[in-house]
Amino acid sequence: DFHFEAGRTYKIRIEFVNDRRGARVIFGYSAGWENFSAAVEAARKADVAILCMGDNEETSGENFDRTDLNLPGRQLELVQAVYATGTPVVLVLQSGRPVTANWENDHLPAILEAWFPGEQGGTAIAKTLFGNAAPGGRLPITFPRSVGQIPCHYSRRPGGGKRYVEMDWLPLYPFGYGLTYTTFAYSDMTLSRSVIGPQDTVTVSVTVTNTGKYTGDAVPQLYVRDMFSSVVKPERQLAAFRRLTLAPGESRRVELTIGPKQLRTLGPDYV
């Protein structure tokens, strides 16, 4: 790393040997970390601090390998410095990968995963944070606590052990996880039948009630597990889901139907 002073001109010579196909030179610079104190002071005077952290095209994308899944660089240091002011912190993650946000999860009151949201992402994030829209998405991947848990996809096959020496074996955020500005209760679940044939379907019905103070989207999810398969099957598989918007106090009956397509298995003879 080289330090460049403002107002001075520097001559830079780069020597590069291309010893493999597809090699390239990337020249860039960092604005430095002198604004840490300015950010901390601004947060100290604010009612709420919104920190947008995460990746860009240089740190996350196709054909990128990583040795850790933490926030890049010194981003966590900035988050911790702002948190130390006592001002409530909302963390907006913009990333194309899971983040091992253990400290952030334990200390911050709100985390919004925005992924790489595109040119109108700022508008969508602002509407969500200011209450004009309620978050309703559910994670399509699993967020591990550490790279040592990888692979930790939700549909993993049964293994011998579920314990680590230094941490919980459960992921930080499981597949299908997600919060919104309200709460929901599920009750009166019933099955249309208890036994089905090879070509039959079964419908699971459940009542979903918005028990909070705000309108929000509930996402009932139905998972299946084969307890007596002739081949090793995942511990659970997503078979069906619905997304519905409920006003405060509103209840609705939801039906999720599954059949041979969701329950079939490729046998040991590939039939």
Where are these regions (language model features)?
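Secreted, periplasmic, or luminal enzymes acting at the cell surface/secretory milieu
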Residues: 94-217, 223, 268-271
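Acidic/polar, compositionally biased interaction segments
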Residues: 1-48, 57, 65, 70-75, ...
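Intrinsically disordered, low-complexity Pro/Gly/Ser/Thr-rich segments with frequent PxxP/GP/PP motifs
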Residues: 230-270
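Solvent-exposed, conformationally flexible loop/turn segments
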Residues: 7, 198-199, 246-251
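Hydrophobic beta-strand positions in extracellular immunoglobulin-like domains
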Residues: 16, 208-210, 258
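Short acidic, flexible loop segments centered on an aromatic residue
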Residues: 213-230, 236-238
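Structural beta-sheet core signal
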Residues: 14, 51, 91-93, 141
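Loop/turn elements at helix/coil->beta-strand transitions in domains of secreted/extracellular proteins
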Residues: 44-49, 85-90, 107-109, 135-137
